[in-house]
A protein has these predicted regions:
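Helix-loop-helix "sensor" segment of P-loop NTPases
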Residues: 148-200, 218, 222-227
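N-terminal pre-P-loop "Q-motif" helix
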Residues: 14-26
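Conserved NTP-binding/hydrolysis module of P-loop NTPases
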Residues: 2-10, 62-63, 73-91, 179-182
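Sensor-1/coupling segment of RecA-like P-loop NTPase cores
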Residues: 40-41, 119, 123, 130-156
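C-terminal alpha-helical "lid" subdomain
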Residues: 3-7, 12, 18, 38, ...
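Conserved catalytic segments around the Walker B and adjacent sensor/switch elements
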Residues: 36-37, 59-71
Length: 257
């Protein structure tokens, strides 16, 4: 099931209560802690979704800087992006010195690095140290659990960070998510198709991971046996045709009589 931009944004707005608490924790730590933050969890759990939800949180004291991790990324490029934001603010307030610009305005730059698993371990360590020495900078890495374990094994950086792990959906939340998808996307799954048996089947197959649930709906869309609405519609059409033929036949019999 391919999702368009609007559908992706709609899915990004599905934030269950336990994930709302993670978002609140994220906001609290950005405000009150200098520690680097790591959003972690398995592929498809919704790490980038939480990052999107954070960016939807408007705070006049924050400037977001989103960087997508890739193998070409280096410290100079990140520092250049950081300085670009400072000079953008400087152009709006030329009376302030560059060195004290964000301190005087009480602004923080929140550096968001999605897909940080592509970064070299030494680069992650360097970014953490850079953030510690820059009081206006907060940094958030997005990593899978495996990437956290692998990179921590090589550079031991986890003790310098605060981990925020995204939980899997519970079975009731899986049901809510399916209902949400049926209303917000172009999936053939209708709200009325969702029942206990379907929820149980999808939950067991996906482990409550939203990305896997979305992928599972592609099977649903491509397999008519799952689509009770389509079957009901076909049966209804066949029934109407049969009724019309019977009525026509009875009329012909009566006419000949």
């Amino acid at each position: 099931m391919l999702l368009n931009y609007q559908e992706n944004r709609a899915i990004s707005s599905f934030i269950p209560q336990d994930r709302t608490r993670k978002l609140e924790l994220l906001i609290h730590l950005i405000t009150h802690s200098k520690q680097a933050l790591i959003i972690c969890g398995p592929d498809g759990i919704g790490k980038s979704t939480l990052l999107n939800a954070l960016q939807d949180y408007k705070n006049d004291s924050w400037q977001y800087c989103l960087i997508l991790g890739n193998s070409e990324l280096n410290f100079d490029l990140i520092q250049k992006q950081f300085n670009h934001l400072i000079y953008q603010t400087k152009s709006k307030r030329p009376e302030l010195s560059t060195s004290s610009l964000h301190t005087d305005l009480q602004k923080k730059i929140v550096l968001l690095i999605d897909d940080a698993g592509y970064l070299e371990s030494d680069l992650i360590k360097k970014i953490i140290e850079y953030a510690i020495n820059n009081p206006i900078l907060r940094v958030i890495f997005v990593l899978t659990n495996e990437e956290v374990e692998s990179k921590n094994h090589s550079i031991g950086f986890v003790d310098d960070c605060h981990l925020i792990e995204i939980p899997v959906l519970s079975k009731p939340q899986c049901c809510e998510f399916l209902q949400y998808l049926s209303l917000k996307t172009q999936s053939k799954l209708s709200f009325n198709d969702i029942n206990k048996a379907l929820v149980k089947e999808i939950y067991l197959e996906t482990g409550g991971i939203p990305g896997r649930i979305i992928a599972r709906l592609a099977d649903y869309d491509n397999n008519p046996k799952y689509n009770s609405s389509q079957l009901t519609l076909v049966a209804a059409v066949i029934g109407l045709i049969a009724l019309a033929l019977i009525t026509q036949w009875l009329s012909a019999v009566q006419f000949r009589a």
